[in-house]
Curated annotation (Swiss-Prot):
Residues 1-50 form a transit peptide. Phosphorylase is an important allosteric enzyme in carbohydrate metabolism. Enzymes from different sources differ in their regulatory mechanisms and in their natural substrates. However, all known phosphorylases share catalytic and structural properties. This is Alpha-1,4 glucan phosphorylase L-1 isozyme, chloroplastic/amyloplastic. Pfam families: Phosphorylase. It comes from Solanum tuberosum (Potato). CDD domains: GT35_Glycogen_Phosphorylase. Keywords: Allosteric enzyme, Amyloplast, Carbohydrate metabolism, Chloroplast, Glycosyltransferase, Plastid, Pyridoxal phosphate, Transferase, Transit peptide.
Length: 966
């Protein structure tokens, strides 16, 4: 391809070889490339021009001036040139070969060239307009592969496919070389990534902030012993997407102490200092120039902290200790926290995310403000969204920066913080509502503990003002449940309310104890605040004086002193202006159960924002056959941005032509999965069987155990029948599981082991053959989901009712025409409403029944179903190997005790579940009916686009406006 300076680079192809002619400025060299793609570099120097980069960096119009890059769209020829350029001059691999890994890196670098134009334009317009910007802080971002998503959003899929074909490669094969970014694990991180996609697509000014984990959570292997965890070094050869910003780094402090200076201010001094360095990843929107940033923090120490003397003295470990301590903060996601060291590391991770991100946000606010910084305008320019409780330390950290570093007083800083920060709750599980050891936090973050104590005291006084002191029992109950600090004495001002007085009388008179009543009109009077926000003196003025000689505090019976804790979820609710659940039923549980006391105090804070998923990744790009059908029958591609157009499929649901196309698309996706399962597990399955899939984090409340018990029951019944009876009573099924159990979650790992043992037995049973297969897919991730979900016939969302906040995989399955079996839990409730009750297989107890059922169990009144007992006995018989499953089955037995009594109601819901599965078989036999149900699931999934969710966040919580990059 000719260039401005006369150099050119082009390819000629023959059936046996590839010929590339490199023309240098002074001489010409020719070389041949065989089919194995071995490069031989010419000895003399040559010039390879990157045509795409030339257009980006030096855009020249015919008139000689700069061109408008907004209309620049690379063609296949310029992309081919760009890929060659990066293969040669952006070296990651040795120069001799142009095999798939190198082709991927060169292609990704070429895509990044295109992204950079829009990325820089987006950054520039945000700087110039200085509009309010949202910042999404999350410990997880489960991005998946970026290549196909990026070129799809840029509308360059065809051009890149042609360019790679010119270079002897297939786009799909090249894309498969990309490792999934190991920055997340489950729904929390995938939701964050879907949100970033929607934010960019909808042109909202926003950034994401996270940590750059070197090894992610772990890579899962399945062995004869079950799950094995190994490090997943997804950055082993680097990432072509990230851009290190060496000029963007911030100091992070741990430990040390707090002292009062001569000016009366509090200073956090000493301790351990590291720095957080920014790595930026571009997030392109679909059919828009807007390209926002995901900024990831990596931790290190300044080079000055390297102990050169110790190193030269042979004390190498000591010399590198500071660097090692800093780097390990970003080694893995969710390090084990059974040990004190693990807890410290997790808290360091959370604080690093919060501190670095807030320093960056504040620096940007100050830069955009110019010479006159008005801190009261900070919430008008900044919205911080905390994705679950992991970023809770944003609240005391923002307070610390504003008070200690920017010179604001307590009231000013608290007003700004509350107007800036908002919190998304993702769980009703008590163990997931984080609590940190007060002692540990005080050691690691002493200044923040002072601020949290002051916030807690503010809260205590607000509770007293709300509820008064007429009913001290009620007040005590509210204080116990609502305080941020758990197992703490009350502030002295409030403790006086609970003092039990004694009246001294004559010796021959009976001593009587009375309570000193404080009327509702009593006032809480405080003096001015110091820089910690603590009250320097607080007292209660009673409406009437009592003639009491002596007051004696009530002393409890001697008991074990419970550990002091910091309740992070309570701090989130107190410190933010909005609290949202992620599904309608979940938000009601949040208001009525989880945070009911706070809802009574601040009802205006609580909202619902039902989750969503991006239709770009989860239909448009992962399921091209279905996408083409949707476009054909709706008459437009607009459904990718306006998913309400999916509803137009409803009127064609019974159309025979559509149904035939629909089934063919599903089958083509299933054929891909057949090959994938054979490659990854060694098991052979047939595409004409029903694909019954449950893929999600392994947890007892998600009830993979209920699913596999149902499969065991099905298998046992099959074994009791003749071959003819089996075919009459059961449709062929391939039951697919996927998901990771946390390394320290023993019971979840037992479930993985059990599933794989059941599969090993059933899959090798010649009597059963293809009538039933059980496959556990190792190392489930986004890329595997993109393969499995389009091929699914039935998906299982069977959590104990009231325990799943929302779920998002259920939305992805529905979008891809998969019919669901599930409980009335999380987003299942809304999905069932949208797709139609008759197109959803419902079973099980409902959320409002759960507490009563657990009490019934505790009272010994529960009678298990005979079929459930039959399954347990069958497992214990050794039908699935010699492994001792007593601990697993024992969790389903008994009426009380930790880890027993079937807390997640597997036994209670089992009969309802297997009867519902019989209805599934019946429906699947009628393929016309099943296909109609499938089409109506896709048509009814329009509500569950993350675009809708983001519009609601932007309007109701963040108060930000979209700005389109021209």
């Amino acid at each position: 391809m000719a260039t401005a300076n006369g150099a050119h680079l082009f390819n000629h192809y023959s059936s046996n070889s590839r010929f590339i002619h490199f023309t240098s400025r002074n001489t010409s060299s020719k070389l041949f490339l065989t089919k194995t793609s071995h490069f031989r570099r010419p000895k003399r120097c040559f010039h390879v021009n990157n045509t795409l980069s030339e257009k980006i960096h030096h855009p020249i119009t015919e008139q000689g001036g700069e061109s408008d890059l907004s209309s620049f769209a690379p063609d296949a020829a310029s992309i081919t040139s760009s890929i060659k350029y990066h293969a040669e001059f952006t070296p990651v691999f040795s120069p001799e070969r142009f095999e798939l890994p190198k082709a991927f890196f060169a292609t990704a670098q070429s895509v990044r060239d295109s992204l950079l134009i829009n990325w820089n334009a987006t950054y520039d317009i945000y700087e110039k307009l200085n509009m309010k910007q949202a910042y999404y802080l999350s410990m997880e971002f489960l991005q998946g592969r970026a290549l196909l998503n990026a070129i799809g959003n840029l509308e360059l899929t065809g051009a890149f496919a042609e360019a790679l074909k010119n270079l002897g490669h297939n786009l799909e094969n090249v894309a498969s070389q990309e490792p999934d970014a190991a920055l997340g694990n489950g729904g929390l991180g995938r939701l964050a990534s879907c949100f970033l996609d929607s934010l960019a697509t909808l042109n909202y000014p926003a950034w994401g902030y996270g940590l750059r984990y070197k090894y992610g959570l772990f890579k899962q292997r399945i062995t004869k012993d079950g799950q094995e965890e190994v490090a997943e070094d997804w950055l082993e050869i680097g990432s072509p997407w990230e851009v290190v910003r060496n000029d963007v780094s911030y100091p992070i402090k741990f430990y040390g102490k707090v002292s009062t200076g001569s000016d009366g201010k509090r200073y956090w001094i000493g301790g351990e200092d590291i720095k957080a360095v920014a790595y930026d990843v571009p997030i392109p929107g679909y059919k828009t120039r807007t390209t926002i940033s995901l900024r990831l923090w990596s931790t290190q120490v300044p080079s000055a902290d390297f102990d050169l003397s110790a190193f030269n003295a042979g004390e190498h470990t000591k010399a590198c200790e500071a660097q090692a301590n800093a780097e390990k903060i970003c080694y893995i996601l969710y390090p084990g926290d059974e040990s004190e060291e693990g807890k410290i590391l997790r808290l360091k991770q959370q604080y690093t995310l919060c501190s670095a991100s807030l320093q960056d946000i504040i620096s940007r606010f100050e830069r955009r403000s110019g010479d006159r910084i008005k801190w009261e305008e900070f919430p008008e320019k900044v919205a911080v969204q905390m994705n679950d409780t992991h970023p809770t330390l944003c609240i005391p950290e923002l307070m610390r920066i504003l008070i200690d570093l920017k010179g604001l007083n307590w009231n000013e800083a608290w007003n700004i913080t509350q107007r800036t920060v908002a919190y998304t709750n993702h769980t009703v599980l008590p163990e997931a509502l984080e609590k940190w050891s007060y002692e540990l936090m005080q050691k690691l973050l002493p200044r923040h503990v002072e601020i949290i104590e002051a916030i807690d005291e503010e809260l205590v006084h607000e509770i007293v003002l709300k509820y008064g002191s007429m009913d001290l029992n009620k007040l005590e109950e509210k204080l116990t449940t609502m305080r941020i600090l758990e197992n703490f004495d009350l502030p002295s001002s409030v403790a006086e309310l609970f003092i039990k007085p004694e009246i001294s009388v004559d010796d021959d008179t009976e001593t009587v104890e009375v309570h000193d009543k404080v009327e509702a009109s009593d006032k809480v009077v405080t003096n001015d605040e110091d820089d910690t926000g603590k009250k320097t003196s607080v007292k209660i003025e009673a409406a009437a004086e009592k003639d009491i000689d002596k007051k004696t505090p009530v002393s409890p019976e001697p008991a074990v002193i419970p550990p002091k804790k910091v309740r992070m979820a309570n701090l989130c609710v107190v410190g933010g202006h909005a609290v949202n659940g992620v599904a309608e039923i979940h938000s009601e549980i949040v208001k009525e159960e989880v945070f009911n006391d706070f809802y009574e105090l601040w009802p205006e804070k609580f909202q619902n924002k039902t989750n969503g998923v991006t239709p770009r990744r989860w239909i448009r790009f992962c399921n091209p056959p279905l996408s083409a059908i949707i476009t054909k029958w709706t008459g437009t591609e607009d459904w990718v941005l306006k998913t309400e157009k999916l509803a137009e499929l409803q009127k064609f649901a019974d159309n025979e032509d559509l149904q035939n196309e629909w089934r063919e698309a599903k089958r083509s996706n299933k054929i891909k999965v057949v090959s994938f399962l054979k490659e990854k597990t060694g098991y052979s399955v047939v595409p004409d069987a029903m694909f019954d899939i449950q893929v999600k984090r392994i947890h007892e409340y998600k009830r993979q155990l209920l699913n596999i018990f149902g499969i065991v029951y099905r298998y046992k019944k099959m074994k009791e029948m003749t071959a003819a009876e089996r075919k009459t009573n059961f449709v062929p099924r391939v039951c697919i599981f996927g998901g990771k159990a946390f390394a320290t979650y023993v019971q979840a790992k037992r479930i993985v082991k059990f599933i794989t043992d059941v599969g090993a037995t059933i899959n090798h049973d010649p009597e059963i053959g293809d009538l039933l297969k059980v496959v556990f897919v190792p190392d489930y991730n986004v890329s595997v989901a993109e393969l499995l979900i389009p091929a699914s016939d039935l998906s299982e969302h069977i959590s104990t009712a009231g325990m799943e906040a929302s779920g998002t995989s259920n939305m992805k399955f529905a979008m891809n025409g998969c019919i669901q079996i599930g409980t009335l839990d999380g987003a299942n409730v809304e999905i069932r409403e949208e797709v139609g009750e008759e197109n959803f297989f419902l079973f099980g107890a409902q959320a409002h029944e759960i507490a009563g059922l657990r009490k019934e169990r505790a009272d010994g009144k529960f009678v298990p179903d005979e079929r459930f007992e039959e399954v347990k006995e069958f497992v214990r018989s050794g039908a699935f190997g010699s492994y001792n499953y007593d601990d697993l089955i024992g969790s389903l037995e008994g009426n009380e005790g930790f880890g027993r009594a079937d807390y997640f109601l597997v036994g209670k819901d089992f009969p309802s579940y297997i009867e519902c599965q019989e209805k599934v078989d019946e429906a699947y036999r009628d393929q016309k009916r099943w296909t109609t149900m499938s089409i109506l699931n896709t048509a009814g999934s329009y509500k569950f686009s993350s675009d809708r969710t983001i519009h609601e966040y932007a309007k109701d919580i963040w108060n930000i406006e979209a700005v389109e990059i021209a």
